[in-house]
C-alpha cells in the first residue's frame, strides 16, 4: 500500500500534518527568497517573528553565555593559545638575555679599558664630583695617644687603622667599632728591645698590599717590622744614619723602600729579612716617600726643593722643580701622576713626563698672620684616592680640604672644607674610598714650631658619602 493511501485510511489528521509540513517548507522558501513583495498575512506574521529574533540576536550577551563560549574552546584552540603564550615568553626571555649580554660586554670592555689605563698609569676615575661634604657630627674621633699623631695607615681590607705618635706608641684600631685592638707601647731605652717597640718619635709607617707586614720608622734610625695581624715584632732593619722619615711597600710585593734625613733611599726585602741597595741624590734631609706597583719610588726632598723619581733597576733618578719652599709631603695618584705639598702653602700636580708641575695651587689653605705680615699655611699632608681625580690636603688652618683634579691633571679645583682643628700630620683614603682618615696633633710631626692648645691628639675617621651626578644634557 502506498504511503498516500495509508494516509487517507488514517484520516484527515495525517493530511493536515502533511499540509502543515508543506506549508512550513513554503514559508522557508518564501523567507529565503525575501518574499519578493507577494506574501500574504501569514507572510507578515513570519516577517514580524523574524524581526524579533534579529533583535534578540543583537542584544548584548550575558556573562553566562561568554563563559559557555570559553568552555566550548576546542582542544586545538587551547593548544594554539598556549603555544602563542609560550613563544611570547621565550621572546621576552631572549630580549632580556640580549640586554644582559650587551651590559656585560660593556662592563668587560670598560674594565679592560681601565686595566690598560691603569697599567699605563693614566687611569683617572671621575669620582670627586660625587663626594658630599660630611657634617662635623659624622666625623668619628678616636683618642688614645698622649702626644701628636705623626703617621697612620689603613689596612688593605679597610677593617683596621694603625696610628703612631710622638709618644712612641703604635695603636691598632677597629674601623667598625672604633676600639683599640692592640697597643705597641713605648720601649725603654737600653732595654735591648724587651718589650719590642720604639723609644723615639715614630715618623712613618707602611703596610704591605697583602696586609701581612707593617713597617715603622723612628728618629732613632730604626725600621721595625711587625706582623700586622698579631702586632708581633719580627725583626729590625738598621743602616740609616739619621731619622727615618718615609716608608712604602711596592704593591704586590714585600719590597720595602725607606728614606731618611741622611738623604738616602734604601731598598729592603722584608720577606727575606735582607737589605738590597742604597741610592743617593738628594742634597738635604728627605721628608717623605711613596710607591705603587712599578719598581720605582718618589720622594719629597724637603729643603733641597726637589721631587725625585727613583728608577730602581736602572739606578737612575728624575728631578722635578716647582715649589719655592720645603717639600714636606708627597703621594702618587697613579703610576704617572703625583701630588705634593710644601711649606710655601702650595700644592702641585705632577706628570712623570714633565719636569715642571702640571698644576700649581698657591696658598692652598689660605694665609695667616697680621695684615701686611701674612704667611701661607704650611701643607703638612697630602693624600690621593688611587686612580681617581680626588685629592685631600691638610695643614693647621682648622680644616682638611678636598680637591678635584681636572682633565689631564692640569687643574686643581676646591670641592669642600672639612673642619678639623690642629695639625693634620697624616691623611689616608680607604681602599674603597668610603672614608678618609686624618691624624691630628697639637704639633707638626717634624718639629715644635707652634702648639695649638685647643687641638686634640686623635685619629679622625671622615665618612665620604657619594651622590651620583646626573649626566649633562645632550651627553
Swiss-Prot record:
Protein's UniProt name: U3 small nucleolar RNA-interacting protein 2
InterPro entries, per database record: G-protein_beta_WD-40_rep, Rrp9-like, WD40/YVTN_repeat-like_dom_sf, WD40_repeat_CS, WD40_repeat_dom_sf, WD40_rpt
Pfam family, one: WD40
PTM annotation (Omega-N-methylarginine): residues: 10
Organism, as annotated: Homo sapiens
Gene: RRP9
Cited PROSITE patterns: WD_REPEATS_1, WD_REPEATS_2, WD_REPEATS_REGION
Residues making up the signal peptide according to the UniProt record: none
Task of the protein: Component of a nucleolar small nuclear ribonucleoprotein particle (snoRNP) thought to participate in the processing and modification of pre-ribosomal RNA (pre-rRNA). Part of the small subunit (SSU) processome, first precursor of the small eukaryotic ribosomal subunit. During the assembly of the SSU processome in the nucleolus, many ribosome biogenesis factors, an RNA chaperone and ribosomal proteins associate with the nascent pre-rRNA and work in concert to generate RNA folding, modifications, rearrangements and cleavage as well as targeted degradation of pre-ribosomal RNA by the RNA exosome.
This protein's UniProt keywords: Acetylation, Isopeptide bond, Methylation, Nucleus, Phosphoprotein, Repeat, Ribonucleoprotein, RNA-binding, rRNA processing, Ubl conjugation, WD repeat
Family per record: Belongs to the WD repeat RRP9 family.
Segments annotated as WD repeats: 144-183, 197-236, 239-278, 281-320, 322-360, 374-413, 419-460
Subunit structure as annotated in this protein's UniProt entry: Interacts specifically with the U3 small nucleolar RNA (U3 snoRNA). Binds a sub-fragment of the U3 snoRNA surrounding the B/C motif (3UBC). This association with the U3BC RNA is dependent on the binding of a protein called 15.5K to the box B/C motif. The association of the protein with the U3BC RNA was found to be also dependent on a conserved RNA structure that flanks the box B/C motif. Part of the small subunit (SSU) processome, composed of more than 70 proteins and the RNA chaperone small nucleolar RNA (snoRNA) U3.
Modified how: Acetylation at Lys-12 and Lys-25 by KAT2B/PCAF under stress impairs pre-rRNA processing. Deacetylation by SIRT7 enhances RRP9-binding to U3 snoRNA, which is a prerequisite for pre-rRNA processing.
Principal subcellular localisation of the protein: nucleus
Motif (Nuclear localization signal): 8-40
Entry remark concerning the domains of this protein: The WD domains are required for nucleolar localization and U3 small nucleolar RNAs binding.
Biased composition (Acidic residues): 65-74
Region of interest (Disordered), ranges: 1-75
Amino acid at each position: 500500500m502506498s504511503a498516500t493511501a495509508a494516509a487517507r485510511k488514517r484520516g484527515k489528521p495525517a493530511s493536515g500534518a502533511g499540509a502543515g509540513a508543506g506549508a512550513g517548507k513554503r514559508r522557508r522558501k518564501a523567507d529565503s527568497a525575501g518574499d519578493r513583495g507577494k506574501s500574504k498575512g501569514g507572510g507578515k506574521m513570519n516577517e514580524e517573528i523574524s524581526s524579533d529574533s534579529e533583535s534578540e540576536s543583537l542584544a548584548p550577551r550575558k556573562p553566562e553565555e561568554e563563559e559557555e563560549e570559553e568552555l566550548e574552546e576546542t582542544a586545538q584552540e587551547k593548544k594554539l593559545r598556549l603555544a602563542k603564550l609560550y613563544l611570547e615568553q621565550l621572546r621576552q626571555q631572549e630580549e632580556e638575555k640580549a640586554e644582559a649580554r650587551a651590559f656585560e660586554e660593556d662592563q668587560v670592555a670598560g674594565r679592560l679599558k681601565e686595566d690598560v689605563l691603569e697599567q699605563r698609569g693614566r687611569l683617572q676615575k671621575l669620582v670627586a664630583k660625587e663626594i658630599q661634604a660630611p657634617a662635623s657630627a659624622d666625623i668619628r674621633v678616636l683618642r688614645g695617644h698622649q702626644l701628636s699623631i705623626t703617621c697612620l695607615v689603613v689596612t688593605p681590607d679597610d677593617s683596621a687603622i694603625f696610628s703612631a705618635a710622638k709618644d712612641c706608641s703604635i695603636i691598632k684600631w677597629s674601623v667598625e667599632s672604633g676600639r683599640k685592638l692592640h697597643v705597641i707601647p713605648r720601649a725603654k731605652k737600653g732595654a735591648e728591645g724587651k718589650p719590642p717597640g720604639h723609644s723615639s718619635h715614630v715618623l712613618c709607617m707602611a703596610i704591605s698590599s697583602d696586609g701581612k707586614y707593617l713597617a715603622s720608622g723612628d728618629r732613632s734610625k730604626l725600621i721595625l717590622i711587625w706582623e700586622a695581624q698579631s702586632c708581633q715584632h719580627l725583626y729590625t732593619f738598621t743602616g740609616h744614619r739619621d731619622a727615618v722619615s718615609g716608608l712604602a711597600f711596592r704593591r704586590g710585593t714585600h719590597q720595602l723602600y725607606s728614606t731618611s734625613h741622611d738623604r738616602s733611599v734604601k731598598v729592603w726585602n722584608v720577606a727575606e729579612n735582607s737589605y738590597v741597595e742604597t741610592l743617593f741624590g738628594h742634597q738635604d734631609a728627605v721628608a717623605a716617600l711613596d710607591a705603587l706597583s712599578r719598581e720605582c719610588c718618589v720622594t719629597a726632598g724637603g729643603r733641597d726643593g726637589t721631587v725625585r723619581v727613583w728608577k730602581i733597576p736602572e739606578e737612575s733618578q728624575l728631578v722635578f722643580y716647582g715649589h719655592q719652599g720645603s717639600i714636606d709631603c708627597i703621594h702618587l695618584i697613579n703610576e704617572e701622576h703625583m701630588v705634593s705639598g710644601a711649606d710655601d702653602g702650595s700644592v702641585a700636580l705632577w706628570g712623570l713626563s714633565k719636569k715642571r708641575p702640571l698644576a700649581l695651587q698657591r696658598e692652598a689653605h689660605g694665609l695667616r698672620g697680621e695684615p701686611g705680615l701674612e704667611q701661607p699655611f704650611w701643607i703638612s699632608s697630602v693624600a690621593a684616592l688611587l686612580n681617581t681625580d680626588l685629592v685631600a690636603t691638610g695643614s693647621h688652618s682648622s680644616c682638611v680640604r678636598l680637591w678635584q683634579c681636572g682633565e689631564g691633571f692640569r687643574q686643581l679645583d676646591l670641592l669642600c672644607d672639612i673642619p678639623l682643628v690642629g695639625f693634620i700630620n697624616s691623611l689616608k683614603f680607604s681602599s674603597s674610598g668610603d672614608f678618609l682618615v686624618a691624624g691630628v696633633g697639637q704639633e707638626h710631626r717634624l718639629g715644635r714650631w707652634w702648639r695649638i692648645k685647643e687641638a686634640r691628639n686623635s685619629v679622625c675617621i671622615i665618612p665620604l658619602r657619594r651622590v651620583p651626578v646626573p649626566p649633562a644634557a645632550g651627553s
